Amino acid sequence: MQFKAPVESYSGQVREITIGKGAKALKIGGETTLPFHFFDEGSIPNPPRFALEVWDMEPVTWAKWLLEPFKDVVSDPVKWAMKCAKDFAVDAVCLQLASTDPADKDTTPEKAAALTKRVAEAINVPLIVYGTGDEKKDVQVLSKVAEVCDGENLLLGPAIKENYEEIAKAALQHGHALIAQTPLDINLMKELNIKLGKSFPPDRIVIDPLSSALGYGMEYSFTLMERAKQTGVIFKDGMTQMPIIANLGGECWKTREAKESKEQGILWEGVTALSLLLAGANILVLRHPETLKLLREIIRRG
Amino acid sequence: MFIIGESIHIISKVVSQAVKERNPKPIQELAIAQTKAGADYIDLNLGPARKNPEETVQWLVKTVEEVTNLPLSIDTLNPVAMEAGLSICKKRPLLNSASGRTDSKERMLPLAKKYNTDLVLSVLTDRGCPPDVESRIESIMETVAYANELGIPNEDIWIDPILLPVSADQKQVGEALEFMKILPDILPGIKSTIGLSNISNGTPEELRGILNRTYMVMLGRYGQHSVIADALDKELISLNKGEMPEITSLIYRVMDGEEVDLSSLSQKERDYLKTTKVLKGETLYSHSWLEV
């Protein structure tokens, strides 16, 4: 008796979001089935997207094998971003405005915004921009970035429960998409999306549920992303149907394990990334270009 | 079902202050209010009762018994306080609670036999809270058997499934409900209770009531014997008395998966419908569940 594999079909859809403008435009999400379920009915119009993380200042804590691919450009964010776009086949660049941390360099919003614009204009891929997570500073920085980069259609974040209103307003006014971030809690994730949705279009939101590294809580991120994806695709909950971003590079490379050897670092980032892809991440932010290459190869072969 | 009034709780500032100062007035006011509201038991929750346990609990029991004839539920983890409280209650009290934890089986459980009280037994074990229906069953069968061997019959035992907040772990809400549904089959004659207000712990204050009331109705459908709850919630008392049959039947219909046309419902009915769907696990919980 021939085995006939069951084929499922779902009625929910992950929203498709476009970031970047003109020839740079990049589509994320849009699927009507579960991650990698090519055997089920439904479509997966966009493959997983990959970005590399670029800092607006030279990092002092990165392992030398992590800095190696960028060693000649690491003190110039524009050149660094250009190198990622040109040499490492990224879908997007993620600019981490680390220098705006008030506890560190406390770079002004104006300076950060001017740099962001230069980076955005220099590369031929869309730009993701992350603040440091400082509740108050991010409002000033991200609002200014939004204003100065009007029309670039950046993906800006993090907008959190404590400061989303102002950041969303600036994003809406200047035509950018928004990263809604909550601390590994699916109920708070839904709550923030509902609150945001009152003044900001849900189809311009990307969910960042926080990505933890292997051994440091990855399974929490995994189950959350999986649940969010299933709740959206199977149960059609509109407030969990946004594409998901896994900003995992920093989390992986700050581990003790990644600092022990290059091979271990790449594996740490790679295993975390692959796991979160399976859970439903639509766009991933990595640090090492070799991890990115490895993942594309795995997906290609699969 | 029986309502065990929860208002006299050491976490309340009013109560802990009154206990500290040995001021009977605020305690007695709460006891009277709960009695008038229609509670069937008054719970006295002392928490760990580390300071002067015997003297504190006995003062509380005497103070409350001055103004109400309702039986008391002595609610503490401290066996010394528990014994001191149970020993002087005028009416047959409720020992709230013992569990499958080794120290509880050895020190708390036997007090129910010694003082001839009713006994709340929770599903907790040395390994903590069982994560699903199966493990709750396993744990409680073992603990009840232990109690039976001490001479405590099922009829005197009230099982507590340990309820977690819907905002913390939505899945557990369904597990607890499923467990209560199965209980009469696995332990015939056994009674039940539950910390009802736990369901809404962490939810914005003004939205807690509807979560508590809806879950109570859902539990009631499966024969829940009692709840430890806010007796001062008039709508809760009313629902329990069967005075709101449309709401009760609406909740049952949603539990059964019936499609209900929202436009045919009043605002209140819509709220109960949405709340039932969340507690069923059909809708993912968020604090804004009534707005969506």
Regions found by a protein language model. Name each.
Chain A
Residues 162-299:
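Catalytic alpha/beta core domains of metabolic enzymes, predominantly
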Residues 49-79, 104-107, 131-135, 157-158, ...:
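Active-site mouth loops of central-metabolism enzymes
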Residues 61-65, 89-119, 123, 129-136, ...:
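Glycine-rich, proline-tolerant flexible connector loops at the mouths of alpha/beta enzymes
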Residues 46-48, 89-91, 123-127, 150-154, ...:
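Short, well-ordered coil/turn segments that N-cap beta-strands
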Residues 133-135, 139-142, 147-159, 164-166, ...:
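Phosphate/pyrophosphate-binding betaalpha-module
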Residues 104-130, 143-151, 226-246, 301-302:
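Alpha-helix-loop-beta-strand connector modules within alpha/beta enzyme cores
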Residues 1-71:
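N-terminal amphipathic alpha-helix/helix-capping segment at the start of soluble metabolic enzymes
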Residues 85-88, 117-122, 143-150, 166-174, ...:
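Acidic (Asp/Glu)-rich catalytic clusters
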